[in-house]
Amino acid sequence: MDFNLNDEQELFVAGIRELMASENWEAYFAECDRDSVYPERFVKALADMGIDCLLIPEEHGGLDAGFVTLAAVWMELGRLGAPTYVLYQLPGGFNTFLREGTQEQIDKIMAFRGTGKQMWNSAITEPGAGSDVGSLKTTYTRRNGKIYLNGSKCFITSSAYTPYIVVMARDGASPDKPVYTEWFVDMSKPGIKVTKLEKLGLRMDSCCEITFDDVELDEKDMFGREGNGFNRVKEEFDHERFLVALTNYGTAMCAFEDAARYANQRVQFGEAIGRFQLIQEKFAHMAIKLNSMKNMLYEAAWKADNGTITSGDAAMCKYFCANAAFEVVDSAMQVLGGVGIAGNHRISRFWRDLRVDRVSGGSDEMQILTLGRAVLKQYR
């Protein structure tokens, strides 16, 4: 596996550096985080560069650049302080519809290319069905040639502003043998109520509770095949976990570099604190974790490009990077001292964001269970 970037990949990374240096994006991110607002202007700037088309096949007007390129771009964005967690639907969201959607659904989603606007997200989690997805209660029932959706979802990302969501529901006519199907739902339909929730971190991407009261759909609104809901979302989970891990690494690298610069400039007891051995020890441990994360992520990206990545790989990346990155940011915050916890330094935002990532997108505990099963399966 050769992880040296080719000329095209270097061009993408250079473009990211140029964009991030073009203005004071950090002030914009801090404002969006404070007000819990999606940074649309920034995402539009990325879309103008073609970042939202990185994984779209060439026959559909995309770049088909692959996951190694995506990883390089994601890492550099994060290293320079960008909230890449708001971008999760950009690289893969279009392809999901190209694989599973009807032509009408595809046309609606592909119209968002180049806009920077939020377009769709999945609605799976419920008050009584978090990690235990099989316990979901939202139902779809057929009456008089129509489909009616009833139930509630919670902690649904991006749902305050997305015009469409894909809802996982069970067939109300089959209570003894659950059939899980997804439905493409226009959020402007009658019977939908959205309640925005406050959260510790990841504040630039909304998190909502959604209730459905006899929301009327048509058969053409089915997303994918009936009864295939679980199989479809398993693939989405793996993709999301890899992206979360990339975000974790980039954020941790940014915090590490901020702390390193500070340690070389901050003078106490007559010399830079970076000369103190206890501070050097922190940076040694941070560097080990960052290097391990980077190698793990590039290996996973290479596997994804070669069709050999597994759910175990995605779980390993998600678990290790979520925890290692949080530890790096926590250590970097310790180095910064009062500047990191009492001022307006971005590291406090990073700390909040990374703590959330140990729960969202699949909890630490579920990643360990998934990985443990995957490891033992290799030796059967």
From Swiss-Prot:
It is found in: Cytoplasm. GO terms for biological process: carnitine metabolic process. Gene3D superfamilies: Acyl-CoA dehydrogenase/oxidase, N-terminal domain, Butyryl-CoA Dehydrogenase, subunit A, domain 2, Butyryl-CoA Dehydrogenase, subunit A, domain 3. Its main location: cytoplasm. Catalyzes the reduction of crotonobetainyl-CoA to gamma-butyrobetainyl-CoA. Its cofactor is FAD. This is Crotonobetainyl-CoA reductase. Belongs to the acyl-CoA dehydrogenase family. One of its GO terms (cellular component) is cytoplasm. It catalyses: 4-(trimethylamino)butanoyl-CoA + oxidized [electron-transfer flavoprotein] + H(+) = crotonobetainyl-CoA + reduced [electron-transfer flavoprotein]. Pathway: Amine and polyamine metabolism; carnitine metabolism. Keywords: Cytoplasm, FAD, Flavoprotein, Oxidoreductase. Its EC number is 1.3.8.13. Homotetramer. PANTHER family: ACYL-COA DEHYDROGENASE, ISOVALERYL-COA DEHYDROGENASE, MITOCHONDRIAL-RELATED. The keyword Transcription does not apply. InterPro entries: Acyl-CoA_DH_CS, Acyl-CoA_Oxase/DH_mid-dom, Acyl-CoA_Oxase/DH_mid-dom_sf, AcylCo_DH-like_C, AcylCo_DH/oxidase_C, AcylCoA_DH/ox_N, AcylCoA_DH/ox_N_sf, AcylCoA_DH/oxidase_NM_dom_sf.
